[in-house]
Each structure stands twice: as C-alpha cells, then as structure tokens.
Amino acid sequence: MNNVSMRELLEAGAHFGHRTRFWNPKMSEYIFGSRNKIHIINLEKTLPMLNDVTNYVSRLAANKAKILFVGTKRAAQDSIREHAKRCGMPYVDHRWLGGMLTNYKTVRQSIFRLKELKEMKEKGLFNDMIKKEALMLTRELEKLERSLGGIENMGGLPDALFVVDVGFEHIAVEEARRLRIPVIGVVDTNNSPDNIDYVIPGNDDSMRAVDIYVRCVADAILDGKNSNTVGRVSSDSEFVEVTSNSNEEEKSGE
C-alpha cells in the first residue's frame, strides 16, 4: 500500500488529461469528464490502480527482481533518475536506444566499453595520453555514460518495465512486449492502455504528478527489499522476534 492521498494527487494536478481533441477513446473508462476542453481523469480509479502497482513491484522486489525505470521526457527525467538510484534499480532517463532490450547482447558490449573507460579514467590513464586522444576518449565516455549509465549494473534483461508516458516511450514498450516482459505504465488520456499490464491513469506531463508515481513505486520496491531482509533474519535465528505494524497544471504545446 502506498502513502499517497487523493488530495496529494489533486494538488499535483494528476487529474488533468490532455485536450479533448487529442483523446484516445480506449481511455474513456478512466475519464471523469472535461473542463475547459481538458479531459479530467478519475482519480478514484487512479488511486487503487496505483496501489495495485505498488503491491506488484513490492512482491517483485522481495524476490530480488529487477525493474527498469524508463522516463526520457523532460517532466520525468529527474524523478526517474533520483528514485531509481534511491531504490537501487536500473533506469533510462536520456534516450531509449533501439534494441536496448531486444538486442541486449550488443548493448552489453557497449556497457563493457563504458566500464573499461571509467576504469581507465579512475586509474589516471587519460593523463598519460596526448591531449587529442584523451579528449576523444573523454567524449566517448560521456556519451556512453549519458545513454547507458543507468543500466550499467543491470546485469541482464529486467523482470519488468516501469514507464512514464507509454506513448512517448512506445519503442521501449514494444520491445518489452516482444520479450514478454511485464509493463507498468503511466497512461494519459491521449494514449492507449492496450498492452500495458499495470496501468496508472494519470497526468504524465506534470513534474509533480510524475514524481508522486515514481516515488510511490520506489518506496514500494524498498519495502519489498526490506521485507525480504526481515524474512531472512527471522528464519536464520529462532531467537529473533519480528513484529510489523500492520494547483492546476494546464497542458501546453498542443
């Protein structure tokens, strides 16, 4: 169960969808109505669905599963990076490279190269090179770090994807579907919930709203990891007793 309230979602503008002329009819069951030609998302459906997502990722994390956070649009980048790091999960916050999942063997070679360059820099080997060569390697390192730094330690394909804006990240969603990797997605009124295993109907353009979704998922992952740790401690020692207590943001640029 997440700690977010209906009031918090409202204050973050999570209920504001896109302009009515851009709507996707497949999202009709999640739409409460419209105001000033903006669709209003029914948060009474969003909140329990967000709870379903947090319960799901908590179970995954308890089983040491890897959940890849994906959010490359401006409204999502900072939250995706911050909260994925906080809960120890891989992330993509810059640009989704085609084949990042479906051609992972090739991507892994680039990750090896990234680690090699980082090790060279840490050992000060760049300082022993001529200026031009050191500059070229530095630029290569920066480029690889920007595109692959978040999945550097993923160690294989993820067990699930958590995506902010399934339309913007449609390539990532398509690759996951091809590999039968479950997809958790924030879906706004202009996109389709089809092929999304766990839907979070909500505003995907508000930074405050996006931060709430991502924070809730990260918190649930940490809870799952902690429950796994508690379970191991209690099973390892019969002497350990474990107790548990049970502003409106209008869309722009359309």
UniProtKB/Swiss-Prot annotation:
One annotated Gene Ontology cellular component of this protein: cytosolic small ribosomal subunit
GO biological-process terms attached to the record: translation
GO MF terms held by the record: structural constituent of ribosome
InterPro entries: Ribosomal_uS2, Ribosomal_uS2_bac/mit/plastid, Ribosomal_uS2_CS, Ribosomal_uS2_flav_dom_sf
UniProt xrefs under SUPFAM superfamilies: Ribosomal protein S2
Gene3D superfamilies, A to Z: Glucose-6-phosphate isomerase like protein, domain 1 (3.40.50.10490), Helix hairpin bin (1.10.287.610)
Keywords, sorted A to Z: Ribonucleoprotein, Ribosomal protein
Keyword Amino-acid biosynthesis: no
Entry keyword annotation includes Ribonucleoprotein: yes
UniProt record similarity statement: Belongs to the universal ribosomal protein uS2 family.
UniProt-recorded name of the protein: Small ribosomal subunit protein uS2
